[in-house]
Each structure stands twice: as C-alpha cells, then as structure tokens.
Amino acid sequence: TGTTSSDWADVSNWSTGAIPTSSDIVAIDGTFTNEPSISSTDAVAKTVIVTTGNTLTIDETSSLTVSGDFTNTGTVTLNSTADDYSSLIVTGTASGDIVYNRYVNVYDDTLGGGWDLVCSPVGMSIADFITANGSNIQVLDDDYAFSQFNNATGQWERYATAEQTGNFEAGKGYSMATTGGSTVAFTGAMQTADQSINIINNNGLNGVGRRWNLVSNPFPSYINGNAAAGTNNFMDANSAV
C-alpha cells in the first residue's frame, strides 16, 4: 500500500503486514501514496506483477529475484552508479519492457580514455538507443564514442552520428564513453533464457587476423564468473570450449 514510504523492506508498506518472501505473489496494482522502491536490500518474490500506471524501482546495490514469472505493463527501472549496480533475476518468464539506467564513464580527452565496456541487458535497436541517449554520448568528429570490435581487422569501429540500423546483439560487448560521466538508458524486454554466443575466429594465414571476441553479460543481473559456490558458473559451464 505504500502507506509509510516507498521502502520495499518496510512491513508497514504491505497489505499483508509482511515483507514478501520467495513464496509470495506480489501485485503492484492500484493507487498508492508511495510507489515501491528496492533500496540497499535483496528482495525476493515468487511472482511479480506491475500494472499500467504503477512503478517499481530497483536502486544500485539492490536486487530482486523472482523464482516464477515477472509481468510488467507499468514502469520498472533499474539504476546504477560508477561503482554499484542493480540486479533483476527472473527464473520463469518475463513480459513487458524494463529500463536499465547504466552508468558509463566520462570520455577523457587528454588521455583518450574513460571508455567502459557495456552490453545491452534488453532487446533494443541501435537507432532507438541513440535517439534516447545521443545527447549523453560523447561525439568524436562525426562518430559517437560508441563502438564495436571487428576482429577481422583488429579495430574498433565507431557508430556514425548518421542514422543507424540493426539491434544490439545479446551477449556482444560494446565500448562507450559519455560527455559527463552519466547513465544511458537501455529500454526493452529482458532476456531470461540461456544465451549461446558465437565466438568468431579470424586468425588468418597471413597473421593479421584476430581471435578476440568481446563477450558480455546479456542479463540485467549478475553472473557468477568463477565463484566456487556459483551453480554453473561461467568458467565451469564453458570449460570444454
């Protein structure tokens, strides 16, 4: 009900008088004094439903894990800073768009640095991304400070400020820098299924080819890299590759 505040972890904000558990169905539906926000906590639920006109915010350093399905026709926003990120894990199916505000480093004109390696955690077109975030992305000559790596040439290829086509590829990494150290918004449907990333080997006979591929996390959540406690962590799952 949001009677006291927007704090998900405050029992007085819930109609049941209890903080949701992994067995609960959470419906954010109706008119509330305060819309819910998950802040500095790891929230759980069995099912989450956010209806039209309602919002749910997951702040940096916070997470929401849904063991069942996630349905959104309202507005669900995940935030981040330079050092901290939010996480949304859905074990079942997910429907509706989410917004992930991803912090990206400021371009350093003196050193040519400040680039971050990023991946879209949602399905989104390049054109829509540039339209929504173009004013935040650094421009270098006639190109954005937003590029993909071409391992056939061993070069980074920047996106031009002219109109772009195509979509972000799930699991493919990109490099990016912003004008002032700010967030860029990725808006679209989140991935929930396992993703297989094609690794391209361009190691040509003349020695100028490249084998490097920039593989990135395609989910709005954390992936265990090589944690011993992580079930099917990334390194173990790909040990035969």
Place the predicted regions along the sequence by residue.
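N-terminal exported-region signature
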Residues: 3-19, 23-38, 44, 49-241
